[in-house]
Amino acid sequence: MYILEISLKFTPMPVSVQRKEAEAAQAAYQQVVEALRSGQPSVLELHCEFQAEKKLAVLTSGIASVQLYEKSGGSATVKRPGFAVIGE
């Protein structure tokens, strides 16, 4: 399972959709990146393959960042990419 996570400006929690296949996840990622590169505000619509009823529409001018990562198969938790703080 692949997770496409979109961080929105002025919003502390990201929004995300899931894809089952790597190719579909990469295509969705490229769709978001191309929308950002265009520089023109538009509505970007995405859907989740894991939860069919989950749909997402965002204004591209409100996107701060996008990341794509793979969810571990055997674990219920997801380790997001980036830095992690480990307590003593």
UniProtKB/Swiss-Prot annotation:
It comes from the Bacteria. InterPro entries: UPF0367 (IPR020885). Belongs to the UPF0367 family. NCBIfam families: PRK13683.1. This is UPF0367 protein syc2447_c. The lineage of its organism: Bacteria, Bacillati, Cyanobacteriota, Cyanophyceae, Synechococcales.
